[in-house]
Amino acid sequence: MEGLKTPRLLCADEIEARVSQYIEGKGCSVLLYKTARVDMDILDETYGLGAWTNDYKEIKGNLYCGIAVNGIWKWDCGVGSNAEAQKGEASDAFKRAGFRWGIGRELYSSPFIWIPENKFETKVVKGKKVPKDRFIVCNIEYNEKRKISYLQIKNANSQEIVFSYVRA
């Protein structure tokens, strides 16, 4: 888009890591994501306070969020979370609209993240064994195509690097 700045790439401390699947005795896969607060901060930083706005619309039972910069709107649909369905759906729609503006789009280049079970503690919740420890993105770098070229994730409790990736 001519005249509009490209949002900067995400810093390591702006990226959250959450367990997406756990296989007992083997390990867990981890997904990277950004929060809606990160989108708001980057919109403010890139375009200025008051230079952007957002709106929500319900279409066929789905909640859409649009973000406008200089009168140009980009929309996307949200998916509710299990915890707080409406708030989660609104937040998800906002983050997805942020992706449409290029905020955090580099996360789509994330490698598959697998952490072996010997790298984290587990606990039992409702009779089911689950990971107890949290994971943190501690280092991230990007190439000239805005793709992840280097990634390190550490166990927040032990501070041990539990995943490393270098793009060939």
Predicted regions and their residues:
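N-terminal, Lys/Arg- and Ser/Thr-rich interaction peptides
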Residues: 1-29
